Amino acid sequence: MAHFTELDSNNIVLAVKLGCNIDIQNNGGEQSEQAATHFESVVPLSEQGVKYVQTSYNHNFRKQYAGINFFYDSTKDKFICPQPHPSWSLDSNDDWQPPITYPTIIDDGADPRIWIWSYNWNEDVYQSDNTKGWKGKKLNTDRRVHTDTATYDWNGTAWVAE
């Protein structure tokens, strides 16, 4: 199945809709304007929609499979994810990166693992202290609550108890 994104006037994805591969082949082929125009004749745009652009479910073209609120960069011919947090910036591959690198220590290092780090980005923490942002807790691999219930901060090289 072919997938088309419906874009608004700012190239923001409003919807992703299914099309027919045979229609693509008979109307200009993959990624063609002709195929998108034909799709529009079969599936009219919504009130906010201005055009269709094909996206690849298998990530074969236009960087990645687009979703609602993705941005289509027509100059680079790719879909870019929404910015996850205000402090994150795009890298040279158009992937969002946090101002503090992702944690590299993700478990206890034992074999077999006994616990892993469960972590997430906290924008409020970062805005109040730009040396912090990742918050983590220990989580047992068997889903039992870990005896260490403290919350930790990632400092870029290690987890530090609050």
Question: At which residue positions do the language-model features occur?
Answer:
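Viral virion structural and adsorption modules
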Residues: 1-162
